[in-house]
Amino acid sequence: LYRKSADLGFADAINDLGFLYYQGASGLKRDPQKGIDLFLKAADLRHPQAMYNVAALIDDGVVAGKTPDDAARYLYAALRSGVRDVLAQLSERPNQFKPATRKALQAELAKNRFYSGKIDGSIGQGTQRSMRIAFGETGN
């Protein structure tokens, strides 16, 4: 069912199938590269969780040829999608990303005029506020 939906271009199914291949599942042989390829395909379709997954995989160094700047662009796009889970994950567990990716995210937020603080990789109150504003929340 996932494969059929993924073949029809449904980003949710592509992302879910990517997870199943990346992790391995009952009846499905583990194939991390196929999982990454599917995550990238879903991210290209602007699927927020796929963009977040790709950023995490880049941060872990498993996506060839991608840098912390690439991870930050995926995180920023995921934030801008307006999906609360992405904001919650970034807000509650920012240290799951390495300092270089966190700095690159701050730089991406600054480039898009959401952040004017120090680019230091510390996800403090200023960066948190900037992420909420980029997400679409107003106020503090």
Regions picked out by a protein language model, each given a short descriptive name:
Residues 5, 20, 57, 78, ...:
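TPR/TPR-like alpha-solenoid repeats
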Residues 2, 7-11, 23-25, 45-48, ...:
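Short helix-capping/linker turns of helical repeat alpha-solenoids
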Residues 6, 17-20, 28, 43, ...:
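Fold-core signature of tandem repeat domains
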Residues 67-68, 75-119:
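Acidic, Ser/Thr/Pro/Gly-enriched interdomain connector segments
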Residues 1, 14-23, 53-60, 89-93:
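Hydrophobic face of amphipathic alpha-helices that form TPR/SEL1-like repeat modules
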Residues 99-100, 110-140:
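Short acidic, glycine/serine/threonine-rich helix-capping segments at coil-helix boundaries
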